[in-house]
């Protein structure tokens, strides 16, 4: 996986370039799916480094940085010793295979680089450790582990708290013209996580122009603003802390025509009146009583009076 479209920056390096020698700078950046790291070394220094990546279901090998075997046999080292590469295999654990002067650090599929540590002295980088999310590989070219004084005073570690594979951007460093690794560092490619919060607020964005209060005011934050100035939303974990906004109407509830012992109308949050159906047990209707039977007899009486007349 390549780190495209994201800015990377250097962290380190451990060590430095030598002003009195020709320095060969190198870098291997932009890919974070490292499957193996190959390192060649003698008893004093690290002489070359190479990387293998997972790509499209296969493996791609990078350029080999440092002095090649042919160059070492031709020119030797700066102190006059030749670099002889042995081929006797020694298996130390499930991740590392050693040929005495050649080492392969093999990473698991879900493993990625998080940092480095090493010792830098006048002869170059030694005691190199590759730190990952699953542990540590090394030390490579272990010369000073038994010296507490050197370990305490000259060991340098790069740890930028990488927690995501995408944050690792690659390696960089330098070799001198004798094939000695004089410096090494890493590239970091920051990404924004939801939990990387610079500011929290109790407001929720409802449109593109105005930030409005949420209808339910919660005691926990509903919105977070990340480093890209984009809003990320969090759902409330508990409903019990939600307090609804209740509207108190400014007008009085009117009593209906039927006089009941209970209130028949009540106000709601939407400023409307809701009426309850009255129970007629205690209702006294307003109006005259029916005079139907008295009207019939009066008509009959008038009829008889007319007949008699």
UniProtKB/Swiss-Prot annotation:
Residues 8-190 form the Jacalin-type lectin domain. PROSITE patterns: JACALIN_LECTIN (PS51752). SUPFAM superfamilies: Mannose-binding lectins (SSF51101). Keywords: Lectin. Coiled coil: none annotated. One of its GO terms (molecular function) is carbohydrate binding. Signal peptide: none annotated. The keyword Disulfide bond does not apply. Belongs to the jacalin lectin family. This is Jacalin-related lectin 25. It comes from Arabidopsis thaliana. The gene is JAL25.
